[in-house]
């Protein structure tokens, strides 16, 4: 009887392990350009959540190449991915890969950047609101004068969502004549060096007569600040987003006005949970039907709430464990230090 009980227990254990393995999900993540600082945080959050859910993680980095991203998706599928999380380098170039996945009944999660294709699940922060927050912070600091708009990548739908939100805030002042836009440029690939070059050209064309810069993320803001600093231009309000450590340090130092914080830990966690649910054929909790893209394709979507971080509330990112105080306050003038650095 004892032997029979032991064998029964072993059989149950083996069956349980087999069942767990049978339902384990392989999640393939395609990164557009993993060299950017913030994606390291996203990846860790995705990995941690997948581990909690008993799923496994495989990934590929396109290194900024839309062509390589197509082959990356093929490779992830070949390696057994049952669901894909895709941070698209190019909203249009990625479509053949997304369509191929759909033909194989492999769900696709459009991560942070919109991919307009039927069946795609879209998860991001409210980018129109991010744009509003950026413009509000700059407008509060400089309600009149010459504005420069440094936009995101022309291949990323977020660039136009952000710009739309920014325009909502400053439109009335433009109409009134209080604000004049003296320069506006997209930033290929969201590259800081491209933003810096564009800003340098705008400074030259405007004769340095610039009062404020609405930059669409922290990378482009870094390029803007570098260009302004090189020309000896100080005290210009500059916006950004992502909560990059370098940007938060600039906010503490006073060279950047705001970084709209999109806690990538939340985005990564929720995207991983959505991916596993979709792979199991389940609905994603908290999702909504949305068709706000350029093509008006109806998608299931999930939007997270961003938080604008200025010198007044830098303590939030420290208390949240997003950045250490010494990194935040490095090089800050003690006489001008924000409360978070005292």
Go through each PLM region and give its residues.
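A residue-level marker of the well-folded mature domains of exported/periplasmic proteins
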Residues: 2, 22-342
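Cleavable N-terminal signal peptides
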Residues: 10-12, 22-23
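Bacterial N-terminal signal peptides that target proteins for export
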Residues: 1-9
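N-terminal signal peptide c-region/cleavage motif recognized by signal peptidases
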Residues: 17-19
């Amino acid at each position: 009887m004892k032997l029979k009980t032991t064998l029964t227990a072993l059989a149950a254990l083996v069956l349980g392990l087999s069942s767990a393995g049978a339902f384990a999900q392989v999640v393939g993540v395609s990164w557009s350009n993993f060299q950017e600082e913030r994606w390291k945080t996203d990846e860790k959050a995705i990995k941690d959540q997948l581990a909690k859910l008993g799923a496994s993680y495989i990934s590929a980095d396109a290194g900024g190449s839309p062509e390589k991203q197509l082959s990356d998706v093929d490779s992830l599928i070949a390696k057994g991915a049952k669901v894909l999380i895709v941070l698209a380098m190019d909203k249009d170039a990625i479509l053949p890969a997304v369509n191929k996945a759909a033909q194989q009944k492999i769900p696709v999660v459009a991560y942070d950047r919109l991919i307009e294709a039927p069946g795609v699940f879209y998860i991001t922060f409210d980018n129109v609101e991010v744009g509003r927050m950026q413009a509000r912070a700059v407008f509060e600091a400089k309600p009149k004068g010459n504005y420069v708009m440094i936009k995101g990548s022309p291949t990323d739908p977020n660039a136009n969502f952000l710009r739309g939100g920014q325009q909502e805030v400053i439109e009335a002042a433009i109409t009134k004549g209080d604000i004049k836009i003296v320069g506006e440029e997209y930033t290929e690939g969201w590259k800081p060096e491209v933003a810096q070059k564009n800003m340098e050209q705008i400074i030259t064309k405007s004769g340095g007569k610039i009062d404020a810069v609405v930059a669409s993320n922290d990378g482009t803001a870094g390029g803007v600040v570098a260009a302004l600093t090189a020309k000896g231009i100080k005290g210009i309000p500059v916006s950004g987003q992502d909560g990059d450590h370098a940007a938060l340090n600039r906010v503490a130092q006073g060279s950047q006005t705001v970084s709209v914080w999109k806690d990538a830990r939340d985005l990564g966690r929720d995207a991983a949970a959505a991916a596993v649910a979709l792979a199991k054929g389940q609905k994603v909790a908290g999702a909504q039907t949305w068709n706000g893209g350029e093509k008006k394709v109806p998608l299931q979507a999930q939007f997270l709430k961003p938080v604008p971080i200025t010198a007044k509330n830098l303590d939030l990112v420290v208390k949240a464990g997003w950045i250490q105080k010494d990194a935040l306050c490095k090089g800050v003038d003690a006489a001008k230090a924000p409360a978070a650095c005292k």
